[in-house]
């Protein structure tokens, strides 16, 4: 989230400077995502049983959660999805975002990758 907001600040963009939020997209990739949630849930499962697993486990694991949260925070309403391409995920997101710009489907794309597979 901090990197996304910093990128927009560096580009001198925000929701008020983008004429059409439908033409403002976000593509952020993550290679693993949610690893801490998996570890925590495994511990809960083994010590407290399956009924104590959070109903929010799946949303914490899916690859597009970061993209969705950033899009909501910055007011982007255009293309919005997450990518998973192992170590190439960030570059893959940049390439896909470039296609939207080249095809004239979007005016602004916020793209990149993020990972912290440490717990």
Q: Across the structure, where does each feature detected by a protein language model lie?
A:
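Conserved FAD-binding subdomain of flavin-dependent enzymes
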Residues: 1-10
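Short, conserved beta-strand segments within well-ordered enzyme catalytic domains
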Residues: 1, 25-29
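Acyl-thioester C-C bond-transforming condensing/cleaving domain
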Residues: 9-20, 28-119
